[in-house]
Regions:
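Glycine-rich adenosine-cofactor-binding loop
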Residues: 14-40, 166-174, 184
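Conserved SAM/SAH-binding loop
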Residues: 71-75
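An accessory alpha-helical subdomain
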Residues: 139-214
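NAD(P)-binding Rossmann-fold cofactor-contacting core
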Residues: 34, 42-60
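Residue-level detector of alpha-helix initiation sites
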Residues: 29-31, 92-93, 139
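ADP-ribose/adenylate-binding Rossmann-like module
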Residues: 84-89, 95-122
Length: 214
C-alpha cells in the first residue's frame, strides 16, 4: 500500500551511514548543491555528473571526496558500485532512466520532486551541526517540509550545536561524578536550560564548562 511504501522509504533517512560508500548525484545546479552539502559531510565518496557544474559544487572538491564529470548523463555512468543515486535534474527522461537502473540493481534512488521514482526520501534538514532536525511530510509535500524547516530555522539558535559539543566534553566527567542514570539525566536537563547552555550557544565552551561543573 501507499502508506506501507512511505514507511519503508522513511526508514532510510539522510542520517544513514554513507562513509566511504560510492554515491552518484546527477545534476550540477542549485538543487544538486543542496543535496551534496549534506551528502559529502557523511564521508561518502560522491561522483557528480552534469553538462554544467556550478562553481559552488566545484569548490566542495577542496575539502571533500568529490569527483566531477562534466558531461550529459548516460545509463553507462550509473555503475554498480553506487549505493545511492540522487537525480537532481529536470533533463527529460533522466530521472526515469536512473530509476529503472537503480531499482533493477536493488540500489537506493531519490529523484527530486518525483516521489513516484524514489525508494528513499530525504527530510528537510535544520542544520545546527552536530544537531540535525529532520522534517518530512513522507513525500506528500516537500514544500510544506521546507516551510516547517523555515519556521524552525528562525527559532533555533545558530550555536545550538555547541550544546552537543559541551555534552561531549563533559561526558566522561559526568559519568564519574554522577553514576546514577536518573541523576545524570536531571543534571543535563538543568544544564541545557541554564546559563551554561547560554554560554555554549555563544561559543564560549570554557565558560560553559565552568558553569556546568561549579
Amino acid at each position: 500500500t501507499a502508506i506501507r511504501r512511505q514507511r519503508q522509504m522513511c526508514i532510510r533517512d539522510r542520517f544513514h551511514r554513507f562513509e566511504d560508500r560510492e554515491c552518484l548525484v546527477i545534476g550540477g545546479g542549485v538543487t544538486a548543491l543542496r543535496k551534496l552539502r549534506w551528502l559529502v559531510r557523511t564521508g561518502a565518496s560522491v561522483t557528480v555528473i552534469a553538462p554544467e557544474i556550478a562553481p559552488e559544487i566545484v569548490a566542495l572538491q577542496e575539502h571533500h571526496n568529490l569527483r566531477l564529470v562534466q558531461q550529459i548523463f548516460t545509463p553507462e555512468a550509473l555503475h554498480e558500485d553506487f549505493v545511492l543515486t540522487i537525480c537532481a535534474t529536470n533533463a527529460e527522461g533522466v530521472s526515469e532512466q536512473a530509476h529503472s537502473i537503480a531499482i533493477a540493481r536493488g540500489k537506493w534512488i531519490n529523484c527530486v520532486d518525483r516521489t513516484d521514482l524514489c525508494n528513499v526520501i530525504f527530510p528537510a534538514i535544520v542544520d545546527r551541526w552536530p544537531i540535525l532536525v529532520a522534517v518530512s511530510s513522507m513525500g506528500q509535500s516537500p514544500t510544506l517540509s521546507r516551510t516547517v524547516r523555515g519556521w524552525l530555522e528562525q527559532r533555533l539558535p545558530m550555536g545550538l550545536g555547541k550544546l552537543a559539543d559541551l555534552a561531549g566534553r563533559l561526558r566522561n566527567v559526568t559519568k564519574e561524578r554522577l553514576p546514577d542514570v536518573d541523576t545524570r539525566k536531571a543534571f543535563w536537563e538543568q544544564i541545557f536550560s541554564g546559563p551554561a547552555a547560554d554560554a555554549a550557544i555563544k561559543n564560549d565552551l570554557d565558560q560553559a564548562e565552568q558553569l556546568a561543573l561549579r
